[in-house]
């Protein structure tokens, strides 16, 4: 019962923060590049996690970007994983997302603006080959 009450309180707060944050990101990226906007995204993702009651704890160190590409792969467990990876990295990164997620109104628009790459899950081998 306690978790239900906490969820009823936190989810509306999270949704408000998310919509306002995505709106702010659209405004910000009108004037600066996606790479320059990463510090805003890092802050935004931490605020979203906190407002949803999620705790981010980073163990170990994340490699610094040194003119070489990295592929970060993680076991996708929840809808907050992408917030966690952006909040935990010090540089801009491009993500991949299932193509159907682009149809969600605010979230899909945010994915497109962020530069995420759509992947068709039905054609997984072709998607892996494209990476």
Which role fits each region the language model picked out?
Residues 1-57, 109-110:
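A transmembrane-helix-recognition feature enriched in membrane-embedded lipid enzymes
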Residues 54-131:
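Soluble catalytic domains of membrane acyltransferases
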């Amino acid at each position: 019962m306690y978790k239900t009450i906490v969820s009823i309180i936190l989810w509306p707060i999270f949704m408000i923060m998310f919509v306002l944050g995505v709106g702010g990101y659209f405004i910000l990226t009108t004037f600066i590049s996606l790479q320059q906007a990463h510090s805003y995204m890092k802050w935004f993702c931490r605020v979203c996690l906190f407002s949803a009651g999620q705790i981010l704890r980073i163990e170990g160190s994340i490699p610094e970007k040194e003119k070489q590409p990295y592929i970060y792969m993680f076991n996708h467990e929840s809808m907050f994983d992408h917030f966690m990876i952006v909040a935990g990295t010090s540089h801009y990164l491009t993500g991949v997302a299932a193509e159907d997620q682009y149809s969600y109104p605010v979230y899909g628009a945010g994915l497109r603006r962020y530069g995420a790459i759509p992947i068709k899950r039905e054609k997984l081998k072709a998607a892996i080959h494209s990476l």
